[in-house]
Amino acid sequence: MNQVARGAGAKRYADAKAALAGVVADGQTLAVGGFGLCGIPEALIAALRDSAVSGLTVISNNAGVDGFGLGQLLATRQIRKMISSYVGENKEFERQYLAGELELEFNPQGTLAERLRAGGAGIPAFYTATGYGTIVAYGKETREFDGKHYVLETALQADVALIKAWRADTAGNLVFRKTARNFNPACAMAGRVCIAEVEEIVELGAIDPDQVHLPGIYIDRLVLNATPEKRIEQRTVRQGDK
């Protein structure tokens, strides 16, 4: 158990600011769950913005949108480097990268997920055929197995993981809700310290063990956000009859 954990009944913190206190610092690497705006730790990201920590390297599928999610940290210039898969939804992300103001390490989406999973499992590196012969493979070791070419990808680990779940018990056992699970479990396992933002906290034993998606051994701190905004990333409506 990480040194910041205080026991099963003491993982809950009063708010996101308190949950981050003594854990986040300048220059750290963070793994942040979410896919677009789905399953992002909204309150923790906002508290991180208010903390004014800077020089961060952030591992996340994307960087939210302008003014919401991780986009807030781009606007305040708290992020030095992104390790991610998708840029297009955030204009400030795109602008900073093209202007040379933000370092960016592109990853195919599946490769990013596997690098996080490997980091959590203690696997230092793995071979994948994805990206061979493209700019993704530049500067990386390649090998041929059974007539097929592969790229060596290294595992990802983070100083702190910030994740979002639907329900937790007081020991930190988590249940995710549908597609909001996405990168969250992998981020949690890859983080040396993991802080989970949840919509409901119940007593130990209230969650059927067979329904636990992520065991509490991976969770160091919990914070309740019972009414997240859950902003819709792309609203699409049916065209009316002409």
Swiss-Prot record:
Pathway: Bacterial outer membrane biogenesis; lipopolysaccharide biosynthesis. PROSITE patterns: COA_TRANSF_1. CoA binds at residues 33-39. GO terms for molecular function: succinyl-CoA:3-oxo-acid CoA-transferase activity. It catalyses: a 3-oxo acid + succinyl-CoA = a 3-oxoacyl-CoA + succinate. Pfam families: CoA_trans. Belongs to the 3-oxoacid CoA-transferase subunit A family. This is Succinyl-CoA:3-ketoacid coenzyme A transferase subunit A. It comes from Xanthomonas campestris pv. campestris (strain ATCC 33913 / DSM 3586 / NCPPB 528 / LMG 568 / P 25).
